């Protein structure tokens, strides 16, 4: 989203690189994606607002998915791409984040993987948002999507970047407020989970 610009996108970059470095020597296959909305044609929003019967939906805007790292791709081959995360978010598309539909897409990709254990970590700096959409409906959609993935065996973790909004949506969550929190709150805990350990609920923010 637009609010991820500045310090928050830098923190996300550092978090991704630190986690990838921690997992590089292991057998864990890591993929890194980003998502935001593509610009919404005004005619679409006008038609939606004018419609007498507003059918429930999770989004109006098309979703852009950025591929920063593929499963099994060595970090040295994609470090530059991850470093360009801020530029890609600034130069392409709109400014909103449709979390529910986006993590559902990532979940479908995970379900195609051969690994028995499937973990989805979501970095977020706030609430789902899209042009013309009901915020309560979008929040409820995200909760439903998370529960749906968990029901299919996917472990879903929320990482709040300078926000505790993740508490509303993710059973397993933590908050990173500054770069000093990265190693303690994210890298150590998530790398432990990904190599087969358990989530330390006592430390969850």
Placement of each model-derived feature along the sequence:
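Acidic, glycine-rich A-domain
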Residues: 1-205
């Amino acid at each position: 989203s637009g609010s991820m610009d500045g310090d928050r996108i830098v923190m996300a970059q550092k978090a991704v690189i630190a986690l990838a470095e921690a997992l590089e020597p292991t057998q864990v296959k890591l993929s890194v994606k980003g998502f935001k909305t593509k610009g919404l044609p005004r005619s679409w929003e006008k038609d939606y607002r004018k419609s007498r019967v507003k059918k429930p939906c999770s989004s109006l805007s098309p979703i852009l998915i950025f591929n920063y790292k593929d499963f099994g791709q060595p970090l040295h081959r994609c470090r530059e791409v991850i470093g360009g995360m801020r530029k890609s978010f600034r130069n392409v598309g709109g400014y909103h984040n449709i979390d529910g539909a986006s993590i559902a897409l990532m979940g479908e990709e995970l379900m195609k993987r051969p690994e028995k254990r499937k973990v989805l970590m979501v970095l977020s700096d706030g609430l789902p948002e899209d042009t013309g959409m009901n915020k309560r409906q979008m929040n409820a959609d995200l909760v439903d999507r998370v529960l749906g993935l968990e029901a299919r065996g996917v472990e879903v973790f929320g990482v709040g970047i300078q926000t505790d909004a993740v508490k509303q949506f993710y059973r397993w969550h933590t908050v990173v407020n500054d770069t000093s929190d990265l190693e303690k709150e994210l890298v150590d805990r998530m790398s432990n989970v990904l190599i087969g350990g358990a989530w330390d609920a006592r430390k969850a923010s």
